[in-house]
C-alpha cells in the first residue's frame, strides 16, 4: 500500500503539452517532411541554440524488379517498399541555422541500416551525405551508431536480414534547451537502497491523441471514463534518523518545499522533465546528482509506449508523488528470466 500526493495543475500546465506531427502526403503519395521543435527551460528566442534531435522515418528495402538486365535498370531510380518505422537519436549540439535548413539536411541524409544482435537485438545505423547544418552532430553521425532495437524500431522483427535496408527521414523532433540541460539520474543512484527510507516515485498520467490499444499499449480509465496512459519514474529517497517516525504529512511537506515544475520534451521521442525551484535536502540533492533539473526519456522508461505515441499529441493530465517503502537491500534483482546456477543451468 502506498500514499499519494497530487501535484497542483499549475506545476505542469504551462509546458505539459506536445503537439502532433502532421502526417500529410504530396502528389507522389509520400509523407511531406516536417520539423517539430519544442522548448524546455528558457532557451534564447534568436541566435544560437542547443538542440537535441531525434530523426523519425521509415525503414525501406528495394523493390524486386521483373526486368532484370534491361537498359531501364540503369536509368530508372530504385523504388523502395516500407518494411517498418523507427527513429535515430543523434543527441545535443549547438546549432546556428534555421529550422527549415536543418530539416532539409536531415531528409537529405543517406542512412543504411543493419539488424544484428549482441546480448539483445540491435539496430546499426551508418550515415553518409552529412550537410553543413548537421556538422555540429557530424562526430556522432560519421562514426555510426548502434541502438537497442526495441527502443528505436516499432517492429524490429519486420526488418529483413538478407536485404539492403535504408532509413528515410521524414520527421525531425527537436528539443531546444535553455537553462534546463539534459541531466539523467545515474542508474547507480536510481537503484540506491537505503535502510529506514521512503521511496519517492512519480506517477505521470498522459492523454494522447491516438488510439493505442491495437499497438499493444492498453489505456486505463480515469474517474470520468476517459482513456489515459501512465508511467512511473523514481525521483529519490527520503531518509529519517533511526527512531524517527515517517508520516504522510512529513513526506508531503518535503515534496511541497521542492516546488517541482514538470514539462514534456522530445528527447528520444517523448521525455518527462522535472525542475526543482524550491529547497532540497542535501541527501535528496545528492541522489539527483546535484542537479536541479533532470530528464526522464520515455525511450528508457517505457520503450514500447514511447514508440507508439512519439508522433502523436501528448498532454500531462496529472502528476502524483507516490510514497512507498524503499526496496530492502537484501532483495535480489533478477534482470534475466533464466535463473543461474540451478540444476543444469550454470553461469558462464
Curated annotation (Swiss-Prot):
Q: Name one GO biological process term.
A: viral budding via host ESCRT complex
Q: How is it modified after translation?
A: A large portion is phosphorylated in the cytoplasm, but not in virion. However, this phosphorylation is not essential for virus replication.
Output one GO MF annotation. structural constituent of virion
Enumerate the UniProt keywords alphabetically. Host cell membrane, Host cytoplasm, Host membrane, Host-virus interaction, Membrane, Phosphoprotein, Viral budding, Viral budding via the host ESCRT complexes, Viral matrix protein, Viral release from host cell, Virion
Please list the residues that carry the modification Phosphoserine.
70
Relay the domain remarks.
Late-budding domains (L domains) are short sequence motifs essential for viral particle budding. They recruit proteins of the host ESCRT machinery (Endosomal Sorting Complex Required for Transport) or ESCRT-associated proteins. The matrix protein contains one L domain: a YLDL motif.
Q: How does it sit in the membrane?
A: Peripheral membrane protein
Protein's UniProt name: Matrix protein
